[in-house]
Amino acid sequence: RRIEFDNSDLKAIIDNFDKYLESISPRIYDYADIKYKHKSNNYSIRAVSPSHQYNEMTIMMQGRFLHEDDITNKKRHAVIGRLVALDLFEDENPIGKYIDGSGHTWKVIGVFQDDGGDREERIVYIPYTSLQKIKKNTDKIDEIILSYKPEIGYVGAVEFEQKLKQFLKNRKAISPTDGGGIYIRNVADNLKQNQEFASLLQLIITFIGIGTLIAGIIGISNIMVFVVK
């Protein structure tokens, strides 16, 4: 059987893992032909919550990202990638303009850029509650994106992963011996490697007397995200 997440799973994780949890966001995937005036193209839709900006390190170029008010009131607001704005609006300011997609009209409230490359900048973010409403008031979600508190470190992150997996298996009635069912991609291993690399690099840089350079390197360890699906 297919394991599905819904809004109640989000609340359950928040209620039971406050010790570890920094932020959490659902993610629902969709695709749509997005149109503005005479221009249109097919884009990837990601329906998320405001904390998704933190998890993805999305950089706002214009306007703003989603707010809790957008989620609560299921607003038809859209945050579009830099290349979406370039495709549809060219030199026109997209903020406050309306685009059509999936048979509905959406107000553009922000434009973002992403270091992940062109593919990430051809994405449209919308409130997850708005997409759920469009999809016949379903509360299903595809993935849950979580970040853990930096102070728990690598050991705490691994502990969090193990406890979260067991919690979700119990919640979804999956056998404890079932290696599948729940998939968690934990980048804590990347964090550990980055910290070890940064520590080694710090020793080298300190030895040659230019320790100030390390400040720009340690930033790579700021990847602390689980993907649960």
Language-model features: locations:
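Non-transmembrane, solvent-exposed regions of membrane trafficking/translocation machinery
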Residues: H67-D69
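Residue-level detector of beta-strand face positions
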Residues: D33, G96-D100, Y183
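Hydrophobic, regular-secondary-structure patches
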Residues: R1-S44, S51, D87, Q132-K133, ...
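Mid-to-C-terminal secondary-structure elements
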Residues: S51-F65, R76-P176
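Peri-transmembrane interface segments
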Residues: V158-E159, S175-G209
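Intracellular coupling helices
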Residues: G209, I218-K229
